[in-house]
Regions:
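Eukaryotic scaffold repeat domains enriched in small/polar residues
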Residues: 1-273
Length: 273
């Protein structure tokens, strides 16, 4: 084959034209692959087998997730498990365009990224940088999983704000992935908290948690390490679980109503919601 498959494929994104983008978080996964929807190879972005370099413009560092900004024809890489940055490339060519680190800083792979709950977070991403999602109104939401935080930027990397969720989580962190609600304003953010085994529904304007659902377990509606999250055009939610979870769950959209129970365990039966 004219390409090297990731040692551990991680992150998949479908472009508007149907192309499939795949990252990897295994050893040597310093590249991203692009295929047609039928599996025909298109290109490799980056070079496989390279070491960490969060300032490189030629390779990446175990990309966790890919998100495509249709209007700008750009792909955002959450880069990643090895590098500590957001990287942006051209969708049509894969050409490198720009990058930035935490708070919009230039990444520094030698910096101290110690995280102590209740203290200011590190000035560099602690990592893994696990999501980088552009919104409809020109912002980019970045999951710094190991520091329990979401940082918000403009698309040019200008820092806007930071919010910490479940700051005493430690271990593998609380901010694993986000998805937006599908209304034009993207009023809500859905946050997958893989360490605490739940999903948080967040008001995007205030960034406050409105409601959570889920708890640890293997039954329907419970989670073992919810790793990734997505929404469809009907606002249904899809979650994937890693480790022993190893499954996909679908949650049907029930509309918007007042919150009566802020922290709900399994979201069933529906007549109790």
């Amino acid at each position: 084959a004219p390409y090297t498959w990731p040692a551990s494929n991680h992150g998949i994104e479908i472009a508007p034209n149907g192309d499939v983008w795949i990252g990897g978080n295994g050893s040597g996964d310093s590249h991203v692959l692009v295929f047609t929807r039928d599996g025909e190879y298109i290109r490799t972005i980056g070079m496989q087998g390279e070491d960490r370099d969060s300032n490189s413009q030629t390779h990446y560092g175990r990309v966790a997730e890919i998100a495509i900004d249709v209007e700008a024809n750009e792909a955002y890489f959450a880069d990643g498990y090895q590098n500590k940055r957001v990287a942006v490339v051209d969708v049509s060519t894969g050409a490198f365009k720009r990058y930035w680190g935490a708070y919009g800083n230039r990444p520094d792979d030698t910096a101290d990224v110690t995280y102590t709950p209740g203290q200011p977070g590190p000035q560099q991403f602690r990592g893994p940088v696990h999501c980088a999602e552009p919104s409809n109104d020109g912002l980019v939401y970045v999951c710094d999983r190991g520091a329990d935080r979401v940082q918000v930027f403009r698309k040019d990397g200008t820092y806007v704000r930071e919010v910490v969720y479940n700051p005493a989580t430690l271990n593998q962190g609380s901010t694993w992935d986000i998805a937006f609600s599908r209304d034009p304003e993207q009023e809500f953010i859905y946050l997958a908290d893989g360490q605490n085994f739940k999903i948080s529904v967040i008001d995007r304007e205030s960034m406050e948690v409105l409601y959570t659902f889920g708890q640890g377990g293997r039954q329907p509606g419970t989670f073992y390490a919810p790793h990734s999250i997505a929404t469809d055009s009907q606002n249904n939610i899809y979650t994937t679980e890693t480790y022993e979870g190893s499954r996909v769950q679908k949650f049907l959209y029930q509309g918007v109503r007042p919150v009566t129970v802020r922290d709900r365990a399994p979201t069933w039966p529906a007549d109790e919601l």
